């Protein structure tokens, strides 16, 4: 009986620790996942191939520190594309990982992969000032021009 009680107490303590830390687990230097219940500025991002390049339209954004953005993503291209928010350094590092595993799909709050002609949404709150990156990290796409800049002021 004592063993059962101690095991249950350990389980409850562990779960309460998980619940306690949940709110900040995705905080990054470029922000955190947005709250879909809160207002957000809508920014439409189109992904496509054009004249031998792969591009985002627009490829430069200005955001206020603390602002929440609802990215409405549309892949108008003929191949899969993704939208990954991060620092340039993080995205370049992850791009190298993607070269080793090109079929890697993301299930992260800062990334969304879309099939051709598909749409999707990503909500992100930019909590710190700085210059950040968004990229398509599918092998060959970023070097073909598929990246952009987010300036948070």
Regions found by a protein language model. Give the residues of each.
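N-terminal edge beta-strand
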Residues: 36-68
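Extracellular/periplasmic metallocenter environments
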Residues: 22, 108-153
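Beta-strand cores of secreted/periplasmic/IMS beta-sandwich domains, seen most often
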Residues: 58-84, 120-128, 152
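Bacterial N-terminal signal peptides that target proteins for export
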Residues: 1-6
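Short beta-strand and strand-turn-strand segments in soluble, beta-rich domains
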Residues: 53, 99-108
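Short aromatic-acidic-glycine turn motif
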Residues: 89-100
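Cleaved targeting-peptide boundary
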Residues: 15-28
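Bacterial N-terminal signal peptides
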Residues: 7-16
């Amino acid at each position: 009986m004592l063993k059962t009680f101690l095991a249950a107490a350990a389980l409850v303590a562990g779960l309460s620790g998980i619940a306690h830390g949940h709110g900040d687990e995705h905080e990054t230097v470029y922000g955190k996942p947005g709250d879909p219940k809160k207002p957000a500025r809508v920014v439409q991002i189109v992904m496509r191939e054009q004249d031998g390049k792969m591009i985002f339209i627009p490829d430069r954004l200005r955001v206020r520190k603390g602002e929440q953005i609802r990215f409405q993503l549309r892949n108008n291209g003929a191949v899969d594309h993704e939208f990954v928010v991060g620092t340039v350094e993080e995205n370049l590092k992850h791009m190298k990982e993607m070269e080793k595993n090109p079929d890697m799909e993301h299930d992260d709050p800062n990334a969304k992969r879309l099939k051709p002609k598909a749409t999707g949404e990503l909500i992100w709150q930019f909590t710190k000032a700085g210059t950040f990156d968004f990229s398509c990290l599918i092998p060959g796409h970023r070097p073909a021009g598929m990246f952009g800049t987010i300036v948070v002021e």
